[in-house]
Design a protein with these regions (language model features):
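PDZ domains, with a preference for the canonical peptide-binding region formed by the helix
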Residues: 1-10, 217-219, 224-228
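PDZ-domain C-terminal substructure recognizer with occasional recognition of PDZ-binding tails
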Residues: 1-28
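Short conserved beta-strand and strand-loop elements enriched in small hydrophobics
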Residues: 2-6, 144-152, 200
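A structural micro-motif recognizing beta-strand termini
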Residues: 30-34, 55, 151-152, 178-183, ...
Length: 231
């Protein structure tokens, strides 16, 4: 069977094979979504080019990486923080005004994050040259004290973590860490959904970004090396 469909306003064709059922009829299974959205964190800017999340965007139902040709990035108004508990990761909840809050475009969905460009006027207004910092090579990253940077309550704050282990042979679980900051634990329970992409700084250098929460202990999580996001 030849199936014609629209993607990004363009007509495309795919060959599919229906399955014959025990009722002597044919059925075709399709998984169709027009778009996908979620809350995450921008990790870094270089000019007006950005990277975010630290991992790919995947479909919640199938777990498969989304094959995307583009999208938009929006400012999000956080309205509620559902704290994480053991075996129950929390999440950031927010609202997006799609016509008002568009600040850039997403050009790619990669294994170690999403990337694209922010509006130049938005960058000039919200980011200052004085905030720039060096990035660290993986061999500079050490176990011990580091900080997660986040705007969970609207203001930029840094939260102390302890890097427990370093792995150079994995894609985006390069660091294991434990949240030590009592304010962050009180606010989120540790790590929650929506914090993916939150930058991690050690010794004044950007070393990586939060990627995953440990379900059995939400005060622990994983992070990706910043170098792997840049690649």
């Amino acid at each position: 069977m030849r199936l014609t469909f629209l993607r990004d306003g363009k007509s495309q064709v795919a060959e599919v094979t229906p399955v014959k059922t025990n009722k002597n009829s044919y059925m075709l299974g399709l998984w169709v979504k027009d778009d996908i959205s979620g809350i995450g964190t921008v990790t870094f800017l270089c000019g007006n080019q950005f990277m975010a999340l630290g991992h790919s965007v995947s479909d919640n139902d199938t777990g498969l990486k989304i094959s995307s040709t583009g999208g938009g990035i929006y400012t999000t108004h956080i309205t509620k923080i559902n704290r994480s508990f053991v075996s129950m990761p929390g999440q950031l909840q927010g609202t997006i005004l799609y016509k008002k809050d568009l600040i850039g475009i997403v050009e790619g969905n990669y294994d170690n994050g999403i990337g694209g460009y922010l509006d130049e006027e938005y960058v000039a207004k919200h980011y200052k040259a004085a905030e720039a910092m060096y990035i660290a090579d993986p061999d500079e990253v050490q176990t011990g004290e580091a900080y997660i940077y986040s705007r969970l309550d609207g203001d930029l704050k840094k939260y102390k973590i302890n890097i427990l282990a370093i792995h150079t042979d994995t894609a985006n679980k390069n660091m294991e860490f434990k949240v030590e900051d009592e304010d962050l634990i009180a606010l989120t329970g540790g790590v929650c959904q929506g914090m993916s992409g939150s930058p991690i700084v050690q010794n004044g250098k950007l070393i990586g970004a939060v990627t995953h929460v440990l379900v059995d202990d939400p005060t622990e999580g994983y992070a990706v090396f910043i170098e792997n996001m840049i690649k």
